[in-house]
Design a protein with these regions (language model features):
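Trp/Phe/Arg-rich N-terminal binding region typifying the photolyase-homology
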Residues: 1-138
Length: 138
């Protein structure tokens, strides 16, 4: 794993890293892969620097405008693969599939409360900008 170029890192808030947190939280949203993923690499590097565990949180929401069975199946297949690959790694993988719209409301905030930092993907497409705006308000 090579260092993440600074141009690939953007702080959403001025909040400092909390060294007393329990873990570094990587919230997987747009870049749903384990390789060639700058945000995941950055989270892993921060966890190593802080000597804290890395928690990878990957969620799928039930009720958003572009939800479709085909898209969700691709995400679910990826989640199963991530679970398989990460089972032998020194990380905690937390996949979450929302059972009904709104059921996962507050979950990210709860996880963030115990985290040293929350690292996530940054992408100008799909719903990512709105997700990041909401996360910055946590």
């Amino acid at each position: 794993m090579s260092p993440v170029p600074p141009i690939r890192v953007r702080a959403l808030t001025a909040a400092p890293t909390r060294a007393d947190g329990q873990y570094v939280l990587y919230w997987m949203t747009a870049t749903r892969r384990l390789e060639r993923n700058h945000a995941l690499d950055h989270a892993a590097q921060l966890a190593e620097t802080l000597q804290k565990p890395l928690v990878i949180f990957e969620a799928i929401s039930a009720g958003y405008r572009w939800a479709s069975d085909r898209h969700h199946q691709a995400i679910l297949d990826g989640m199963l693969e991530h679970e398989r690959v990460l089972a032998s790694k020194a990380v905690c993988y937390f996949p979450y599939v929302e059972s009904k719209p709104g059921a996962g409301s507050g979950l990210l905030s709860t996880l963030a409360d115990s985290a040293c930092a929350v690292i996530t993907d940054d992408s100008p497409v799909f719903g990512t900008p709105r997700l990041l705006e909401a996360a910055a308000r946590l």
